[in-house]
């Protein structure tokens, strides 16, 4: 019975949601502009996200100005864990914004905005640089 119990504990700890569980933030000059919170779901991690209304990046795609994340988080939609990447959507009015969350290590991750080809074309036409993934840190 003991080998079974040890194997079960190993299986539970290997589930992706357990590594993600908790709060993750991205900060710029003391301002938290992205906040995510994860918990285990039945088939995939579940969570909420809040993000600042304005995030500006320099020509290289690095954040150089950001407003604080909303104090009211939005529930993640359509969460999918695939090959070490959690993809999800956030309802933004009539649109759903897509993101990918990728762990770097137990306390650091990257959050990338997933833009459609049309959004990429519009940004290029307006000579707007695309943002690099936001660097997140797990907070206690």
Task: Label every model-predicted segment.
Residues 105-107:
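Residue-level recognition of beta-strand termini and adjacent short loop/turns
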Residues 139-140:
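Short, solvent-exposed mixed-charge patches
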Residues 3-12:
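Sec-dependent N-terminal signal peptides
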Residues 17-98, 122-135:
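Central antiparallel beta-sheet cores of small beta-barrel/beta-sandwich binding domains
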């Amino acid at each position: 019975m003991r080998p079974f119990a040890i194997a079960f504990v190993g299986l539970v700890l290997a589930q992706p949601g357990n590594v993600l569980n908790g709060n993750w933030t991205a900060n710029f000059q003391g301002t938290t502009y992205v906040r995510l919170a994860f918990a285990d779901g039945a088939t995939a991690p579940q969570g909420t996200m809040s993000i600042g209304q304005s995030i500006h990046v320099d020509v290289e795609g690095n954040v150089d100005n950001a407003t604080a994340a909303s104090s009211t988080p939005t529930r993640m939609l359509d969460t999918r864990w695939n090959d070490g990447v959690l993809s999800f959507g956030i309802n933004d009015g009539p649109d759903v914004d897509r993101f990918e969350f990728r762990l770097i290590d137990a306390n650091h991750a990257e959050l990338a905005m997933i833009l459609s080809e049309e959004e990429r074309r519009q940004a290029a036409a307006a000579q707007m640089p695309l943002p690099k993934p936001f660097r997140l840190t797990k907070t206690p």
